Design a protein with these regions (language model features):
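A conserved beta-strand-loop-helix scaffold within acyl/acetyltransferase catalytic domains
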Residues: 67-78, 84-192, 232
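Active-site/acyl-donor-binding loops of N-acyltransferases
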Residues: 74, 83-90, 214-246
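Hydrophobic pocket-lining residues that define ligand/cofactor binding sites across diverse proteins
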Residues: 207
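Conserved donor-binding loop and adjoining core beta-sheet/short helix segment
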Residues: 2-65, 69-91, 162, 169-188
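Conserved acetyl-CoA-binding loop-helix of GNAT-fold acetyltransferases
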Residues: 192-204
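Residue-level preference for non-acidic, small/hydrophobic
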Residues: 59, 125, 200-203, 230
């Protein structure tokens, strides 16, 4: 049954790819690249009237990511370095350092529910951006509430705490065949806990509990700032320019 579903999804993906090509959409104006210093980025932006789990999965397999109610894909001049990376949930085996990270965070309590912007989370988000210098993001309340928390019905928020202290929080999209990590931020004072690694480990466990076969971690960019941790989760697949996962 799963093989037939995969074949049907691939045919639908190809039809969608042909449709997008036929529209000849214009990318956005150039802006500083958030991943590679000294380069410019351009994005192909779409705002579907209705974004459903099935349609979004097809778009992810065409190298699109979601932000708010829209989806985007890099369309940079002379650069094709941004490729989706995903993990095979059942095949994944944690490394020694990842097992150590899990033990180090055994006191962390996670809650999973609808996205809920609060002042406490916004403070952590703003401090995270200040510590990480995350591209062109400003840390404003409007940015935090609109782009992260204004989301389709299949979006969820995972919040991590130790006792009452907020460790970090992330937005994820949950579909029958895939979970996608949209954005994660954490208290920079707790960076020694490796919250980003722990978040991925927790999401992998949540995928197993739900029977979801794939976890999408967003774009991998060779040499990109803050990207190396993604390839430490193995085995992983990277979406090639030809649309094939390898």
């Amino acid at each position: 049954v799963r093989a037939a579903e995969t074949e049907a999804r691939e045919k639908a993906r190809q039809r969608l790819a042909r449709l997008l090509d036929s529209l000849r959409l214009e990318p956005s104006h150039p802006a500083p690249c958030p991943y590679l210093p000294g380069r410019e980025s351009r994005l192909l932006l779409l705002r579907p009237r209705e974004l459903t789990p099935g349609s979004y999965h097809l778009l992810m397999d065409l190298n699109f990511r979601r932000l708010g109610w829209g989806v985007y894909r890099p369309a940079c001049d002379g650069c094709t370095e941004c490729h989706q990376l995903r993990l095979d949930v059942e095949a994944f085996r944690p490394s020694r350092s990842q097992r150590r990270c899990r033990r180090h965070n055994s006191d962390v309590i996670a809650t999973f529910g609808r996205p809920d912007p609060t002042e406490e989370k916004h403070t952590a988000y703003r401090r995270y951006l200040e510590a990480r210098h995350d591209g062109e993001m400003t840390g404003s309340w409007d940015e935090f509430a609109d782009f992260l928390h204004e989301a389709p019905p299949f979006a969820r928020e995972v919040v991590y705490r130790v006792e009452r202290r907020l460790v970090g929080a992330g937005i994820v999209d949950v579909e029958p065949e895939a979970m996608s990590a949209v954005y994660f931020y954490f208290d920079p004072d707790l960076a020694a806990r490796s919250p980003g690694t722990f978040n991925v480990l927790w999401l992998l466990d949540e995928c197993r509990r739900r029977g979801i076969p794939w976890l999408y971690l967003g774009y991998h960019v060779v040499g990109g700032r803050g990207m190396d941790y993604k390839t430490r989760f193995r085995p992983h697949q990277i979406l090639g320019p030809d649309g094939v996962w390898r």
